[in-house]
Structures are given as structure tokens and as C-alpha cells.
From Swiss-Prot:
PANTHER family in the record: L-2-HYDROXYGLUTARATE DEHYDROGENASE, MITOCHONDRIAL
Organism: Burkholderia cenocepacia (strain HI2424)
Region feature Disordered, mapped onto this chain: 524-553
Name of this protein: Probable malate:quinone oxidoreductase
Pathway assigned to this chain's UniProt record: Carbohydrate metabolism; tricarboxylic acid cycle; oxaloacetate from (S)-malate (quinone route): step 1/1
Keywords: FAD, Flavoprotein, Oxidoreductase, Tricarboxylic acid cycle
GO biological process: tricarboxylic acid cycle
């Protein structure tokens, strides 16, 4: 009897302990802060999505978590990217030559139309007072393509002629004349042999963009809203799904003795740049299993010598050397960062196993698993020329880099230039049922089937198209909301061209250029012939291109 009594007492103790655990767990769940949206990462993507959602659903609560001590300190930082407002005006890799010798401009049209959405989104934010002083983040900077050699000159002329079929590119000028090109870019022509066969295109509607400044202003605005909180120096350590379909996300405060913090979020966006893949994998969603990643860094030669800088106002893109992958395209760029004008030349590829400039050398190893190791190895075989190129880049000396600069700036002096390590880019490798693994172009939205969590992978064209990329994300994860009259009306108010193929309407192009140039305080747009019909196949999907063509350094 005593023995039975002891067993009962033991059971009571166990049950009491279990009840206490359940009660504690329930109390913990009840105490955990609830938010509608959690933004992981404090860069251009997360901040853009935050502003979009605040416009469309101002009553939603949002929390942003950033690992570093401030926002826009990684890839969005002005010193960690080339600051090109990518619109395919100058980048030759967006207009590949087909087997029949014709130039395919479908990708260029797609990129350009996306950038027009960004211009409209930024213009609206200026009108609302969210963004202030447009010259602090965007400035008119002509975009140029510059080539030499008979084959390259022939290609550039064909490219120019093909692009004239689209109203988006009709402000472009073409020249093979030494003196004309010297008027556009004196620094690139002085000291050059007049007999060298050169050609250039020039368009005044190009831009230089400080994505770090846009990010800081976006987050600065969001911080003034009562339902937004920002947590800096906060590293996400755990992402788990709750029974009700929400996500429990925990993070630790770095450089602090504060206890870990957590939220339960209805929707999680992982906009952590190079850190996004690891966090998507940590969430356990099956959609993340298809992806691996390969990090590529970039460095630039930089000068801030006023005598040099005043001679160049352009972003001048070249053509990859014979035998080199298209990602190796060098460019000589005017930059305006925090009010100071500088010139960058590059990029030169660098390698690190880090996925972020401020990341860990174990990033590559931590992201590799049984699901993606085979696709990654397959890409290494299929993209061997790319591997060779990267290996060659790592062996470059200071003299090699300076000699590359002199091909664009013949009178360059070594003492005027210094080498700057820019940011890391993580290129997507996706499992493929036929090839095993493929290197993916551009950026890719990875979302759970129910749309409760999503992340952005990839690099190019990246920040330039943050507004349309986040609009696409909302159409994917908030499909029902986007379809409502309220959201539709607001989206069209922010982006007047929403749902319109600008390529098919020269009048709409002029209207959009004029509106955004005025609000963003850019140079007046070029005049185009409204009577000339658009003959470009902008409605056709962009043709698949070699993946390395779109790799972003």
C-alpha cells in the first residue's frame, strides 16, 4: 500500500512538473511580442518593403532586425557597390548577340522598365516627404558604352540600332568620331591614339544612385511611425514555425549582456543579402533546399583627385575581353557619395568564403549541405571558364590593375589611385533536374508555399530594382491583398505606369521620364519622336542568357 502511495505521489510530482512547463510555455508565448511583419536585414530591400507595406497597410506592425550597428552598412552602402542605376543603357551583357548575328534586346527592355518603377517609387516618396533632397541619393550621370577594335565596334553599332526600336532607348547617341567622344569623356580620350578604332554610345538619362542614403532615409522615416521598431546589433539565431502558422524568431543582442529577444510574426521577410540563404535554410521550408550559393567579392580603383574627377562625368561600360566571361566587364564610373564626387574603376573579382563583407569565413561551409553540394559541384564543372577567370583575377598585381585602368584612362597616374575592397555578392546555384545544378541569373524570391516567409537571393541588378522586386514579392505572398481595390488604387498612385508596358507607348515613356526627372531633380529627359512606332518585342519574355553574364561584382 505504501509502495502504491509512493508511485501515486511520484506521478503527481511528474504531472505537476509537466503542468508547470506547459503553463510556463503558454505564459512565454503570451508574453512574446506579436508583429504583423518582421524584416530581417537593414538594407535597401527590407527598407523598401517596409515603406511599401506602410503605404499599403499603415496599421500593420513591423519590426526590423539588423546584425550590424547601423542600417545600410553592407551591400547597400555607397562604398560597397558601383551605384549604377541599372537600366541597360550601357551594360552590354544585357544585349547578347544571337547565333544569327542579331542583337537581342528583350532583357534590356525588362531591366529598363523595372528601373522606371524604381524612379516612380522614389519620386512618390519625395513628394510624401519620406525621401528628402533628391541630390543626396540620385544624380544625373550619363551612361555610356565604350569599345575598341573592329569586332566590338561592329557589335556596338548593331546594339545601338537594335535599341532604337524601343522608345526607352531613343535618347541614345552613337559615335565613332574621336572628337565627339572626347566631348563626352575627355579623360578617356586624351593620350589615346587617334587612329585607334573606337566607338561609344551616350545617353543623358543615366543616373548614379546612393542606395545607402535611400536606405537610411527610408528607415529614418519608418522609425517615426508608432508601429515600427528597429533592433540593431541583433543577430537572428532561431526561426521556428508556431502551431498557428506564425513564425517565432529569436535574436541575441551583440556586444551586450541583454537577454535574447523574440517575436511571433505573421510574415517574415529575409532581406539579409548574403546572409539570406542560411536563414532560409534555418527556417526549414522545403523551398530553400533547392539552393546553394557561391560568394564573389569585388574591388575598385578609386580616385578623389579634384583635377581628375572634374574631367569625367559618365558611367562608361566596356566589353569583356575575348575569352573572358561577361561578368568581367570593366567600367569607369562617376560616383557621388555623401556629397563628394569620386571616380571608380573596376570591378576586379576577389574571393572570400564570407557571404557578407562583415560575415564569417565559415559562411560557405555552413550553407553547404546534402541537398545543394551536388548542384554546386556541377556548376563548378559547367562554368569552368568562370572558375578560370576568378583564379586569374586573384593573381592580378597592382601593376596589372593599373594597366587595365590605362586602357580606359590613358593618362592615369598611379599615385592618384588606391584600391578599395567593396562588398560581397552571393550568386545563386539552383538544383536542376536535368543539369544537376545551374548558376541563376539576377535575383530570385524564395517563399514558403503559404507565403508566410520569404527571402531574396542573388545580386544583379539588385538595388536598382528594389522597388519592382518588392512589388513582385508582394504579388506573390500577399496575392489576395494586392488584388483588392484599395491596394490596386494605392499601387497605381505610387507607380502610375503599373500594369503598363512602357516599351509599347512612347507617350507614356515621355510622361514618366518628365514626371520623375522633375521630382527627382534630374536633367531634363531627351526628346523622342512620338510618331515613331515601337518595334521592339518588349512583351516577349527575355531570352535565357549565359548565367555569368549577369553576375554582379
Amino acid at each position: 500500500m505504501k509502495k502504491g502511495s509512493a508511485v501515486i505521489k511520484t506521478l503527481r510530482v511528474i504531472l505537476s512538473a509537466l503542468a508547470l512547463c506547459v503553463a510556463t510555455s503558454s505564459a512565454h508565448a503570451a508574453d512574446t511580442k506579436k508583429v504583423d511583419v518582421l524584416l530581417v536585414g537593414g538594407g535597401i530591400m527590407s527598407s523598401t518593403l517596409g515603406v511599401w507595406l506602410h503605404e499599403l497597410q499603415p496599421n500593420w506592425s513591423m519590426t526590423m532586425v539588423e546584425r550590424l550597428d547601423g542600417v545600410a552598412l553592407e551591400s547597400s552602402n555607397g562604398w560597397n557597390n558601383a551605384g549604377t542605376g541599372h537600366s541597360a543603357l550601357a551594360e552590354l551583357n544585357y544585349t547578347p548577340e544571337k547565333a544569327d548575328g542579331k542583337v537581342d534586346i528583350s532583357k534590356a527592355i525588362e531591366i529598363n522598365e523595372s528601373f522606371q518603377i524604381s524612379r516612380q517609387f522614389w519620386a512618390w516618396q519625395v513628394k510624401q516627404g519620406v525621401l528628402k533632397n533628391p541630390h543626396s541619393f540620385i544624380n544625373s550621370t550619363p551612361h555610356m558604352s565604350f569599345v575598341w577594335g573592329d569586332d566590338n565596334v561592329r557589335f556596338l553599332k548593331k546594339r545601338y540600332e537594335a535599341l532604337q526600336a524601343s522608345p526607352l532607348f531613343r535618347g541614345m547617341q552613337y559615335s565613332e568620331d574621336y572628337d565627339q567622344i572626347k566631348q563626352w569623356v575627355p579623360l578617356m580620350m586624351e593620350g589615346r591614339d587617334r587612329n585607334q578604332k573606337v566607338a561609344a554610345t551616350w545617353t543623358p538619362i543615366g543616373t548614379d544612385v546612393n542606395f545607402g542614403e535611400i536606405t537610411r532615409q527610408f528607415v529614418g522615416y519608418l522609425k517615426t511611425q508608432p508601429n515600427f521598431t528597429l533592433s540593431l546589433s541583433s543577430e537572428v539565431r532561431e526561426i521556428t514555425r508556431n502551431a498557428d502558422g506564425t513564425w517565432h524568431v529569436s535574436w541575441v543582442k551583440l556586444h551586450s549582456d541583454e537577454p535574447p529577444q523574440s517575436v511571433d510574426a505573421k510574415f517574415v521577410f529575409i532581406g539579409a543579402g548574403g546572409g539570406a540563404l542560411h536563414l532560409l535554410q534555418a527556417s526549414g521550408i522545403p523551398e530553400a533546399k533547392d539552393y546553394g550559393a557561391f560568394p564573389v567579392g569585388g574591388s575598385f580603383l578609386v580616385t578623389d583627385n579634384p583635377e581628375v574627377v572634374k574631367q569625367h562625368l559618365a558611367k562608361a561600360y566596356g566589353k569583356a575581353s575575348v575569352g573572358s566571361p561577361p561578368m568581367s566587364v570593366p567600367h569607369l564610373d562617376t560616383r557621388i557619395i555623401d556629397g563628394k564626387k569620386i571616380i571608380l574603376f573596376g570591378p576586379f573579382a576577389t574571393f572570400s568564403t564570407k557571404f557578407l563583407k562583415n560575415g564569417s569565413y565559415f559562411d560557405l561551409a555552413k550553407s553547404t549541405n546534402l541537398h545543394n553540394v551536388a548542384p554546386m559541384m556541377r556548376v563548378g564543372v559547367d562554368e569552368f571558364p568562370l572558375v578560370q577567370y576568378l583564379a586569374g583575377q586573384l593573381m592580378l598585381t597592382d601593376d596589372d590593375r593599373f594597366n587595365a585602368l590605362k586602357e580606359y584612362f590613358p593618362n592615369a597616374k598611379k599615385e592618384d589611385w588606391r584600391l578599395w575592397q567593396a562588398g560581397q555578392r552571393v550568386q545563386i546555384i539552383k538544383r536542376d533536374p536535368v543539369k544537376g545544378g545551374v548558376l541563376k541569373l539576377g535575383t530570385e524570391i524564395v517563399a514558403s508555399q503559404d507565403g508566410s516567409i520569404a527571402g531574396l537571393l542573388g545580386a544583379s541588378p539588385g538595388a536598382s530594382t528594389a522597388a519592382p522586386i518588392m512589388l513582385n514579392l508582394m504579388q506573390k505572398v500577399f496575392k489576395d491583398k494586392v488584388a483588392t481595390p484599395e491596394w490596386q488604387q494605392k499601387i497605381r498612385q505610387i507607380v502610375p505606369s503599373y500594369g503598363t508596358k512602357l516599351n509599347d507607348s512612347p507617350a507614356k515613356v515621355v510622361e514618366e521620364w518628365t514626371y520623375t526627372s522633375d521630382v527627382l531633380q534630374l536633367s531634363p529627359p531627351p526628346k523622342i519622336d512620338l510618331g515613331a512606332p515601337s518595334q521592339a518585342t518588349g512583351n516577349a519574355p527575355a531570352r535565357p542568357a549565359k548565367a555569368s553574364a549577369d553576375m554582379a561584382l
